[in-house]
């Protein structure tokens, strides 16, 4: 749809004028809700009894594998290190991934829950920082939930405390708030930006904000997509940048990646979107927007036959030395078209397809790909999750009771592929060394819990397996873990894996945030240590 006028600097729309040629998206919203109920009903059959909640449960290195206070449970035969601490919250945690950043001598963790609470925690102790948690500032009588991952960014420069930015939106609960909110580290509100609404579809922002430099100056800009059909870019004060918002005429689920193409002034915005006739496309769009001579320009765009709900990753993946944009697809258009079973890669500079791509997947790839070295070749690979489907409809992806994680080299050759327990995986992989070598291994979740996988061989590590056991099977994952060298004093100090999990509210489990010691002190930095690579969530390989 289109609008009669752009919003003001507070993000308020004067009024809405729908186009007769544009269909509404009531069917899309209804189908999403039905799908999630079906997924939950399949997974509930495998659920164990719910554990009690607690504020913080620090665990000694030799503690028993189960902590009754917060439900930390190791699967059968698991040799993964015992948890350093575990914190349970009253709201469930679904697709919001933990984000980790350092400020001073403290490492902080930020994650959102389905009650609209944003948690900011000391990663060494597991305790909320002073002034936290904070509920998003939804108007009275509205329901607010968070599935966007919080972004931690130094909007006032590297010598001032960071800010935390997150969107309100949910596919699991009926969210009625439509905003992106920025907080100061103290918990004080920095700004609230209200997005619009589109007739017949859900409201809100599930897209994770990315922070970068769009215009080439020193300012840090905030970029995100919205279900109101628009792509936004804001200043640190929450005001729109020139040329924004950009009308996509359909919903945006994807989180943007920001990357400065060599020879350009500022970062390009690479983002996926839905398409149902916009630019003569029925399926999904992957686009590159950038400022050219001071004006915002659509530099290149590809139309694929399926929605693009995946969040793109950017990085060099072959000997060309050119950065590639790698992205998966969704599952709206049914019977599934060809693109549903593909992972795409385009060169960032001009949008040309990378030789050997797209590659074949076992179903939709909802998560964000990870890029990094996972073997001794010295060349980065691509790792992503996908559903396992045996037909051309979303229900055919439920009855397989499985998902898959796969690694490809930059030429599109499959290196290895592993099946994971539980269907319709929404988790994104993280790449970090779990051994003493110079390459990265894979940490990835599913509805069954967290898996550790050898990056070079694809074999399961620490006793995890798709048929028997995961790291804490009560910690259902619909997001990504974070890996960091945690500063400060406390049981979680040092190299750690931080997991936020439990699953949607349909499971009746509290949200759980757990810190585990990394099995080894890595001799190389993790290549892709959290969702969309870094605290600013620019989605670009280091």
Positions of PLM-derived features:
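N-terminal low-complexity Pro/Gly-rich stretches
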Residues: 1-23
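Generic alpha-helical structural signal
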Residues: 2-5, 26, 40, 478
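Secretory targeting and sorting signals
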Residues: 16, 22-23, 29-62
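Extracytoplasmic/lumenal domain signature
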Residues: 59, 63-542
């Amino acid at each position: 749809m289109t609008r009669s006028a752009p919003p003001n600097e507070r993000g308020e729309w004067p009024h809405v004028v729908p186009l007769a040629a544009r269909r509404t998206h009531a069917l899309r919203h209804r189908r999403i809700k039905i799908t999630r109920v079906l997924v939950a009903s399949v997974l509930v059959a495998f659920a164990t009894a719910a554990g009690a909640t607690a504020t913080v449960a620090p665990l000694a290195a030799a503690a028993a594998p189960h902590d009754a206070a917060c439900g930390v449970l190791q699967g059968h035969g698991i040799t993964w290190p015992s948890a350093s601490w575990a914190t349970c919250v009253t709201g469930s945690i679904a697709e919001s991934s933990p984000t980790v950043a350092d400020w001073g001598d403290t490492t902080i963790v930020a994650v959102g829950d389905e009650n609209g609470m944003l948690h900011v925690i000391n990663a060494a102790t597991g305790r909320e920082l002073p002034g936290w948690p904070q509920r998003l500032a939804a108007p009275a009588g509205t329901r607010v939930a968070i599935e966007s991952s919080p972004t931690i960014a130094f909007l006032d420069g590297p010598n001032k405390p960071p800010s935390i930015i997150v969107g309100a939106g949910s596919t699991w609960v009926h969210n009625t708030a439509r905003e992106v909110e920025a907080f100061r580290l103290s918990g004080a509100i920095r700004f609230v930006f209200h997005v619009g609404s589109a007739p017949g579809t859900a409201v809100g922002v599930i897209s994770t904000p990315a922070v970068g430099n769009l215009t080439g100056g020193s300012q840090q800009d905030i970029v995100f997509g919205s279900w109101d059909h628009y792509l936004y870019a804001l200043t640190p004060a929450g005001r729109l940048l020139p040329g924004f918002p950009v009308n996509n005429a359909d919903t945006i689920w994807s989180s943007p990646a920001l990357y400065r193409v060599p020879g350009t002034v500022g970062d390009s915005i690479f983002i996926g979107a839905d398409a149902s006739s916009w630019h003569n496309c029925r399926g999904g769009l992957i686009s590159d927007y950038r400022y050219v001579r001071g004006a915002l320009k659509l530099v290149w765009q590809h139309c694929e036959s399926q929605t693009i709900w995946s969040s793109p990753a950017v990085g060099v993946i072959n000997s060309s030395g050119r950065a590639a944009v790698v992205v998966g697809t969704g599952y709206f258009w049914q019977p599934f078209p060809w693109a549903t079973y593909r992972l795409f890669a385009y060169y960032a500079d001009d949008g040309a397809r990378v030789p050997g791509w797209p590659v074949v997947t076992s179903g939709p790839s909802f998560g964000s790909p990870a890029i990094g070295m996972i073997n001794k070749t010295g060349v980065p690979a691509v790792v992503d999750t996908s559903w396992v489907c045996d037909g051309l409809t979303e229900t055919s992806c439920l009855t397989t009771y499985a998902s898959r994680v796969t690694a490809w080299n930059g030429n599109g050759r499959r290196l290895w592929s592993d099946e994971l327990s539980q269907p319709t995986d929404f988790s994104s992989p993280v790449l970090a060394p779990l051994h003493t070598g110079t390459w990265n291994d894979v940490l990835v979740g599913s509805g069954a819990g967290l898996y550790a996988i050898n990056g070079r061989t694809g074999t399961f590590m620490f006793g995890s397996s798709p048929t028997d056991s995961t790291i804490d099977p009560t910690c259902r994952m619909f997001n990504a873990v974070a890996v960091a060298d945690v500063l400060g004093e406390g049981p979680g100090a040092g190299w750690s894996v931080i997991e936020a999990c439990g699953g949607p509210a349909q499971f009746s489990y509290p949200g759980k945030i757990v810190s585990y010691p990394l099995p080894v002190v890595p001799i190389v930095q993790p290549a892709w240590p959290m969702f969309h690579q870094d605290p600013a969530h620019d989605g670009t390989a280091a």
